[in-house]
Amino acid sequence: RLPLNIGEFARVLGGGIVPGSIVLVGGDPGIGKSTLMLQVAMELARGGTVLYVSGEESERQIKMRALRLLRQNGGDTGAEAMPEGLLLVTETSLSVILEHISAVNPMLLVLDSIQTTYLPELESSAGSVTQVRECASRLRELAKSSGMAAFLIGHVTKEGAIAGPRVLEHIVDT
């Protein structure tokens, strides 16, 4: 397991992140999913390569949030404060994301969000049942074969269920 110093979150994961696991992180809009995942990414990037992919925010927005996290934790907020192993990418095409993964071989992928990610060869739009299922399935196969852990951030519906196909909940490990 990859150890985490984020107590309650590490406890939920059984003490840390299992290499090759795929975890779905869901919750209401604005509750802090992206911030929590950025905090995890920043911590792990101090010991290896972490790829944080956002289809929701610009690189500048992510960096501003990272600096806010560093300030809250009493850390250095200079340019050198960002962990060297943290790679930020703004992208929604899974084909391009897979190229980035292949190029840097991260120990952890954070994808924000699975509903904004799409495969160009499928005719349906991002967030559709087919797109969400296929993107999650391909990422699961990659995680299992490479040992890369992956966190998929997922939106929820007004009823509190993960948006997209119910099969998504069965594709992930946690």
Placement of each model-derived feature along the sequence:
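The Walker A/P-loop phosphate-binding site
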Residues: 1-69, 75, 98, 102
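Intrinsically disordered, low-complexity terminal tails and inter-domain linkers enriched
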Residues: 72-82
